[in-house]
Amino acid sequence: MKKIIFAALTAAAIGTASAATYKVDEYHANARFAIDHFNTSTNVGGFYGLTGSVDFDQAKRTGKIDITIPVANLQSGSQHFTDHLKSADIFDAAKYPNIRFVSTKFNFNGKKLLSVDGNLTMHGKTAPVKLKAEKFNCYQSPMAKTEVCGGDFSTTIDRTKWGVNYLVDAGMTKTVRIDIQIEAAKQ
C-alpha cells in the first residue's frame, strides 16, 4: 500500500513540476502606468488585451515570457487624453503599434518568484527592466479546466531611455510606474 501511495505522489509531483507553455489570457492581462503630473496629481492609463506566451518550468525554476502590448488598446478614462497619449507626442501608436517585453531570467528565492529580468521594447528602442513579482501562483482553474499561472508585477522606468521625452524639459518627471497583471493558461 505504501508503494502505491508513494508512486501516486511521485507521479503527481512530476506532472506538476514539468516544463509547460502557457498562453496569455488577454481577458486577464493588462499593463497600467502612473506618472506624476508636475507634483500636482497623477496621470494614469492602461493597456488591455495583452497577448503572448509564458514557458515555465517550476522544478528548474526557469522560464521565458514574451508579451506584446498593443498601443491601440490604451485607455485612460478620457478620450481626449487617450488620443493624446497615442499621438506622436508620447506613444506614437501609428509608428510604434506595439510594446514588447521579453524576459531573460526568472529570479527565485527557494520556490518563491521574486522578479523577472527582461528587455522592454518601446518606440523602437530596447532597454533592460526588472519586474518585481508582487505575487505569483499556479493553480488548477475550474473555469479554464487547465493549469493557470499568473501574478502581479511592477517596475519603475525612466521613460527617456525609450525616447518618450514629452514635457521633460518643462519639468515633468521622467519616471513612470508600471503595474502588470497577467494570467496564462497551460497549453
Could you describe each region identified by the protein language model?
Residues 18-187:
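Low-complexity, acidic/polar, glycine-enriched regions of mature
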Residues 1-18:
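Gram-negative bacterial Sec-dependent N-terminal signal peptides
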